[in-house]
């Protein structure tokens, strides 16, 4: 394999992106990198901001993901997690509903599952023009 076959590093500053509507109420995102037709295996990687009281329903994914809590406290299952906590969800996984009384900020990285090959979804989840009711969301993927 020659150097021509390798891709260059990319850099993006969070201030260069605007907050976008995430599919769950009380949540906004800045995905600095995300899948596109030209780059279908790119990760969803960026920030998710939560308003106090924000949560989302139990659901499942075929991709893998890592969350790093930067601000706030999040109840996930029986445990309360705060700043400095990193959570890893292998593929496939069920995602217990995180909820926050304080509001908060997380670094999100969702990537193609090494076991399932499932890819994260950007369009219609992290960049919504208008949020749908939770009951209308697909929680099976």
Question: What does each of the following model-derived ranges do?
Answer:
Residues 1-42, 123-141:
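A short, N-terminal "cap"/entry segment at the start of jelly-roll beta-barrel domains
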Residues 30-35, 43-60, 83, 90-94:
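Conserved short histidine dyad/triad with adjacent acidic residue
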Residues 41-43, 60-62, 79-81, 99-102:
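Short glycine/proline-enriched turns and hinge-like loops at secondary-structure junctions
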Residues 51, 80-102, 109-112:
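Conserved metal-binding segment of the jelly-roll/cupin
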Residues 52, 61-76:
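Glycine- and acidic-residue-biased ligand/ion/polar-headgroup-sensing regions
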Residues 58-63, 136:
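Short, low-complexity cationic-aromatic patches
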Residues 96, 100-141:
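Double-stranded beta-helix
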